[in-house]
């Protein structure tokens, strides 16, 4: 079916993951006072842009996708869909998404999404992924944009809460991506993609995974110390971070099967970030300085 091909080229799994984090950022900022139309416009607009980026990424990556067992059945590699059709599909989705964000949210949220799109398509996909071991680091910025955009769609400003979300989700991307690179090591090696495990070895990647999880754990609790989230969120953040760290440290055991271990680290990374996105939504709080700003605004407009 033609529809199925057009859907597959947009990587629905990635869209769904970004939708969850965007909604988490939005609801964190909304603090229970939800503008449902704005939420719908934000997540739909963002999802369309993410779908656009994924479709264009498929066009860019089809040569290396043909070399990787995991991606050899993608529609552009098999010829089930033409590059021209996929590119046109991506452009239309992107234009629709940006139009929805521009007219229904605010310039800051739209600008955040544009930043993420340019980083993912223009910097990561076109150059860094193929040429630098730091491609994962650069790509992590685009992966951290959805919750920030969701947050800024509500607040209209880039404040400490937005900065914490950017840091937190960027740090999460690193062990998540390195774990993929370890259990898909042969694929990345065959395609000549300079990810850390291929360039510097699996041991170096394991060390980086542990360090980034520690940094991520510290970043997650900053939402609580900043007054943006409550103790329910804190309990989940501490529990998931510690379990993820324990799992990562188990990779140093002599009898460890690196591929199986990396899969566990990868799958738990998804559980971790999904749990935190949900808890941000249900246990968000208004920090004192934001309450002061809102009180001042209410006095000004009253």
From Swiss-Prot:
Taxonomy, superkingdom: Bacteria
Record's GO cellular component terms: plasma membrane
Places the protein is found: Cell inner membrane
InterPro entries recorded: Protohaem_IX_farnesylTrfase, UbiA_prenyltransferase, UbiA_prenylTrfase_CS, UbiA_sf
Functional pathway: Porphyrin-containing compound metabolism; heme O biosynthesis; heme O from protoheme: step 1/1
Membrane topology classification: Multi-pass membrane protein
Residue ranges of the TM segments: 14-34, 36-56, 85-105, 108-128, 133-153, 163-183, 209-229, 230-250, 264-284
A Gene Ontology biological process term: heme O biosynthetic process
Enzyme class, spelled out: transferase
Phosphoprotein keyword on record: no
Cell inner membrane as UniProt keyword: yes
Any GO MF annotation of the entry: protoheme IX farnesyltransferase activity
Disulfide bond positions: none
Family: Belongs to the UbiA prenyltransferase family. Protoheme IX farnesyltransferase subfamily.
Function: Converts heme B (protoheme IX) to heme O by substitution of the vinyl group on carbon 2 of heme B porphyrin ring with a hydroxyethyl farnesyl side group.
NCBIfam families: cyoE_ctaB, PRK04375.1-1
Name this protein carries in UniProt: Protoheme IX farnesyltransferase 2
